[in-house]
Amino acid sequence: MRRPARDHQAWLQSQTWSLYELGDLPGVAAVTYGVVRAGRHDPQGVPLLQARDIVDGTIAQSDPARIAEHIHAENLRTRLERGDLVIVLIGRIGDSALIGEDQVGWNTARSVGLVRFTEVGRAWGVDEWLRRWLKAPEARGWLSRHAPGSAHATLPVSALRKLPVLLPPLDRRRHLLHGIDLIEQRRQLNTQRAAHAVELADAHFERSSLRPADALSRPLAEVAAVINGVALPKATTGQDASIAWAAPAEVLQSLGPYLDRTARTMPAPERVACAQGVVLVAPRPGEVKAVISRIPVVPGRGTAALRAGNDLDGLWLLHELRSRSRGLGAIAQGVQAREISVKALSRLKVSWPDTEVRRSFARVASLLHDRAYTALKENHVLGELISTELSDGVPSHYRTALPG
């Protein structure tokens, strides 16, 4: 039974451990989800926050989708306010971010859960604690078990409301939040360093690709093997699931132009298994994203792999596709432009200057990418440290009491 709001402050000041369902957590005013029928993109409309916009604890979207004013007016319950916590409900279940001034007045898509807090909840840090708790192994495990689906796991908002939230004693909660704040400051610095290094590599490519009008351009299939993605087998019984399988979402949602881990593996098929260094490509409405795989990988259905003759040429292709990301709609197909046309991709004309130009570019770009990737790898380690901090010290009886 939900406690009266007047009791919330007392519970939030408690010096004992407590376990709640999210919908009953003191300081939480509402748990809901976004617009079900958003309609078509309206360039003059209200920004719509989508699951893809929530990346690594931030809202990473400078060009959001937009909905018509009348649709927004019909869905004012999900009009974003400062301090709201938004949670991914499809795909990367549980990724979250707090809304800042820049997103006030936006609306939210069906793929996003919305948690609104009371004034007391914000004053006692329930918003900050919940955002961190969603990174705890216990919370991650619970969410994955309650999100049915394979290619696009989906968490119903009814399940989100039942998420177990462990509330530590006030002093311990404050101590944990302070330590995690320090870790996140380091992660933010690393993210900025990585972004700046990649921006420098993009700028170097732009200078390197300036050439006379008659300089050579070639069909992509002439400079790289174009490999179509495959579906994940339904079962791998008796087979060694030995190689990473990259879903389109993992390419699209990767941090930086790198893929170094996937959620699933499969037996390595000879025709489509790719060594590290391959360029992976995946489309979504309005753009195509390209990343370099840092691990051996099989491209999943809805993606394609580009296997250049060497890693240096792979870097050139990566930046060629990055520079044209929003102009490659012709290689996307399907109702939602989420399938890739390998034929169209193979025919795509790419700039291909002489070997010395490509090598000269790659010598500089590879150093910048190494710097960016090192920073992002450290962020992964720091993320694991946050999970450990959240999990350590949980009383054993609560660890076993967390429902599955």
Language model regions located:
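Short coil/turn segments at secondary-structure boundaries
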Residues: 35-43, 63, 145-147, 216, ...
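Short, small-residue-rich loop/turn micro-motifs
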Residues: 52-55, 90, 159, 247-252, ...
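Non-catalytic DNA-recognition/assembly elements of restriction-modification systems
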Residues: 1-33, 162, 166-234, 351-404
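Sequence-specific dsDNA recognition surfaces
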Residues: 20-39, 53-82, 221-236, 244-276, ...
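A short beta-sheet element
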Residues: 50, 75-78, 82-135, 269-272, ...
